[in-house]
Amino acid sequence: RQLEWLKSDLALVKDKEEKMIVFCAHIQFRHNADKDNPDKTKNMAAAMDCLTDLHEAHVMIGHTHYAQNFIHHDYITKGGTPVYEHIHGAACGAWWSCNLNLAGSPNGYSVYEVSGKTMKNWLAKGTGESPDLQMRVYDGNQIYGGAEGHPSGEYEYSWTEGGIGPKGAQAPGFSGLKGCFVASIWNSDEDNWKVELFQDGKKVGDFKQVPYEIGDVCAISFFYNDLGRKTATWSRSTPQYYWYIEAPGGDPTKVQNWEVRATQTIPGGGVVNEYKCSTLQTDYSGFRNVE
């Protein structure tokens, strides 16, 4: 019924190829094709096809309690850009327990700027935070918790190995992060962001995206070792947040005068945003228990 309503509603729109659609729903579209439920897969494809009749299409989603951008490369709008799915972190974050969403992004909201038939610009805005807070940069060698980690705690986590929390809650790691700067950029995507490392004002190289889902192990350690959480919900892993580059000398803590620059180019609108960070997140600074 909802699909038929969408089709009939859009049938009333004239000159659709000259208009943008903002489609709001609760459950995410990304990865929602279901081989065991062909009607669900068919309906999802039909809904996405409806959106491609417009000049530009943005899908606004909640539900997950973490932020993620997902580009539907199989569904291209009349303006030539793919349907763009914005999965928003919750204003309440991890259910009002702290000032973080499940994957470590700040509690907050997104701000969008519309110009005619195009989403001209957008950013993720942490509640009470500067708009410039768009990333954290970590030392890929750091261990959190366990016998040797800092901050201390019962459960040990690292970027390379992940970790296991209470009741066997497992957080994956990625061995390729050893010796690397690791940037968590919660509004990033694989197509429209470029992340670079500079030292003494000169470019060192480009970051690559971590090739599969991992979690922010600093945030996960905070959830289990500081907040005392007990279930697997708090070891959430997500794609697309995490970028890495080998540090000169293999030890990010010893690199001097470095800066990470993350550049976002808005699809369709062409606006360019640049964000910078030159400080390692080595503890739970900025993480707050709000219960």
Task: Enumerate the predicted regions with their spans.
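His/acidic metal-ligating clusters that form di-metal
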Residues: 1-86
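Metal-dependent phosphoesterase/phosphodiesterase active-site architecture
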Residues: 4-11, 74, 79-291
